Regions:
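Glycine-rich beta-strand-centered segment in the early N-terminal region that forms part
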Residues: 1-10, 20-74
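Glycine- and other small-residue-rich loops at beta-strand/loop junctions that grip anionic moieties
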Residues: 41, 78, 124, 128, ...
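Short, well-ordered loop/turn sites that connect or cap secondary structure elements
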Residues: 62-63, 117, 208
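Short, compositionally biased
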Residues: 79-92, 143-145
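Mid-domain Rossmann-like dinucleotide-binding core that forms the NAD(H)/NADP(H) cofactor-binding site
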Residues: 93, 97-173, 177
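Glycine-rich cofactor phosphate-binding loops and adjacent beta1-alpha1 units
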Residues: 158-241
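C-terminal substrate-binding/catalytic core of Rossmann-like NAD(P)-dependent dehydrogenases/reductases
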Residues: 185, 227-278
């Protein structure tokens, strides 16, 4: 189907990483693109929403003019997608601009779902960019309390508090000490590492509780911090969980592994109900 894109969402971290060809990107030599030499062409953008303008002859579930969520479409005026890849935006209460964030929000869904949170567990969301803002809200909806956030930007910390964080910390060298103090010395039960910084992962390992879980939502592309895995992971029974979108279920949702389309539908329901702030 041919879709005219009304909005596409910028994923600053991923797009910048590819533009400067950081390790473990599609543009670096030997990266996940499979191109031995890496480099360009590179088509940034993977998240948006638009309207169907033309259908394939055998498509029955959609009509021209339907609003749809567009994933992996790039920053371009039009995209060509298969019917199975699309989710229609039926609820008129949902603005198309808000709906355009569904795909990137699904990454945060995955990062939180993989933690298998239980009501009453303490959680840290490390990083309050676009993914962190969604992860914070999803953790709150999952019953996390106390719920902490960390970011260097004071405006982001202020927003985190407005969105329900119990406390928001500056991730400096005293972060682990302050989180431990805020949890009575126990540490948090679970954490979502959103920054993609190996230093932030080291911090998380210092403030996570014994047998805690850390979901790696941000892309830790550069391993520039040595980690004592015996001290911080093995001996303390810590679970590190890869939460890249490539690990999600493809056709049928399961606990902790929902399909993209099911996460889109959940996102739309939360937006329509006023339970998620964009």
């Amino acid at each position: 189907m041919l879709i005219e894109n009304d909005y596409t969402v910028i994923s600053a971290g991923t797009e910048r990483a590819n533009l400067v060809a950081l390790p473990n990107t599609g543009t670096c030599p030997g990266g996940y693109s499979g191109r031995e030499k890496g480099g360009f062409p590179f088509w940034p953008g993977y998240c948006g929403a638009g309207r169907i303008v033309k259908l394939g002859r055998e498509v029955e579930a959609f009509r021209p003019g339907d609003r749809v969520i567009v994933s992996w479409g790039g920053h371009r005026t039009h995209s060509v997608k298969k019917a199975a890849e699309l989710v229609r935006i039926d609820d008129e209460r949902i603005d198309t601009l808000d709906a355009s964030f569904a795909h990137i929000a699904s990454f945060a869904f995955l990062g939180v779902r993989k933690l298998r949170l239980e009501v009453g567990e303490s959680v840290m969301i490390a990083g309050q960019g676009i993914l962190g803002v969604f992860a914070l809200q999803f953790a709150a909806l999952s019953g996390a309390i106390p719920l902490f956030a960390s970011d260097f930007d004071p405006a982001r910390r202020k927003l985190a508090l407005e969105l329900g964080a119990t406390a928001a910390f500056v991730p400096d060298e005293t972060l682990a000490e302050r989180v431990m103090a805020a949890t009575g010395g126990a540490g948090v039960n679970a954490a979502v590492e959103v920054t993609g910084s190996a230093k932030a992962l080291q911090q998380a390992l210092e403030y996570i509780a014994w047998e805690g879980r850390i979901s790696l939502l941000g892309c830790t592309r550069i391993s520039d911090v040595p980690i004592d895995f015996y001290k911080y992971v093995h001996r303390r029974g810590i679970t590190l969980i890869g939460a890249h979108t490539s690990t999600r279920a493809k056709t049928e949702s399961a606990p902790g592994r929902w399909t993209e389309q099911d996460d889109y539908r959940t996102f739309l329901k939360l937006v329509a109900a006023g339970r998620l702030k964009i």
